[in-house]
Every structure is written in C-alpha cells, then in structure tokens.
Regions:
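A glycine/proline-hinged amphipathic helix-loop "lid/cap" segment
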Residues: 1-67
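A generic beta-sheet turn/junction motif
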Residues: 58-60, 71, 82
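Short beta-strand element of the alpha/beta-hydrolase
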Residues: 75-85
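Conserved phosphate-binding and hydrolysis motifs of nucleotide-dependent enzymes
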Residues: 83-86, 115-122, 155, 159-160
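Catalytic nucleophile-loop/oxyanion-hole region of alpha/beta-hydrolase
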Residues: 91-92, 98, 106, 111-149
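Primarily recognizes the serine-hydrolase "nucleophile elbow" in alpha/beta-hydrolase
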Residues: 132-173
Length: 173
C-alpha cells in the first residue's frame, strides 16, 4: 500500500533537508528533533478558558501535567491524555496542539500527563505515573470543575498502551 501523497511529500522534504533518521539518534536527540518538527505545525485555533501547567505528587517525585479547560459551564468530563512516542519520546509540548483542539472541540477538560520515559526510567515507571495521575484526577475532579463519573482515558501509540494497561489495573484491582 503506498503512502499518502502528503506524508510522502513530507518525508521527501525531510530527506532533502538532510534530516537525520530517528533510528540513528539517541533518545535525547530524538526528543529534540520531534519537538522541533511539531513546532513547525500551525498553532491551534481552539478557544479555551484556560491552559495551565501544574505538578502532582508521583511515585518518584513530581509529575508534570497540563490542564486544558474549554469554555463552558457545569461539571465537565475529563480526558486523561497520555502521549505517544514509543515510551521514549514525547512530552507536554509535543502534543499541545492536539490537546488544545480536543478540549475545545469536544468540550472536555484535558489533563495531559508528562509520564517518565525510557530508557532513563524503565517499565513500569511510565505506567505508574499514568496510574497516579488518574488517581489524582479522580480525587481532584470537583476542584477542577469536573464530573468524577465522566473520566475517560486516551492516547495514541504508547499512550494508548498506557490507557489499556490502566484499564486492566483498575479491572484487576
């Protein structure tokens, strides 16, 4: 199956510019490169009531989170968002635009979690951070203006894996 023409064009542009392939880089270089690529995207046009960075207590120190609050009233649902990146790359800034668009478009409070990454923090560090963030959101839902009965988990790639693993942890007690 051929690549989408836009994706192929983007990859061709990267190669022509001499971009180093990710698989040849060390994790810190990959993180810097992906954030550089994401910063080239146009900014979000979502209108939000607020976006704020915070920290919550974690199993090995503080966990950074970013809370995206849409305009609207009443207790809103929460989406706990876990970014992708193969458990090695990605952070709050990498998927900032996506979180803004999701909060504004769906009318949900998005809590993006900056879980610890490998290889510096091997499994289950990221999963423990993600589980801790969910427990925090459940406790703090009312203070956030959220409905504690409407908390969803989501993410892509590694973030989707964390979502599934948390669901299994909750099921299994």
């Amino acid at each position: 199956m051929p690549l989408n023409p836009q994706v192929q064009g983007f990859l061709t542009s990267l190669a022509a510019a001499g971009a180093q392939p990710f698989h040849t880089m060390e994790p810190p270089q990959c993180r810097q490169a992906i954030n550089g690529l994401m910063s080239m995207m146009p900014p979000s046009k979502a209108v939000l009531a607020s976006v704020r960075d915070s920290h919550i207590p974690g199993p090995a120190g503080e966990i950074k989170i970013r809370i995206y609050t849409p305009t609207g009233t009443g207790p809103l649902p929460i989406l706990m968002y876990f970014h992708g990146g193969g458990f090695v790359i990605g952070d709050l800034d990498t998927f900032d635009k996506l979180c803004r668009e999701t909060a504004g478009g769906a009318g949900v409070i998005v809590v993006s979690v900056d879980y610890r990454l490998a290889p510096e923090h091997p499994f289950p560090a990221g999963l423990d951070d993600a589980s801790t963030a969910l427990a925090w959101a459940r406790r703090e839902a009312q203070a956030l203006g959220c409905d504690s009965a409407r908390i969803a988990l989501g993410g892509e790639s590694a973030g989707a894996n964390l979502t599934a693993a948390i669901a299994l942890r909750l099921r299994d007690g």
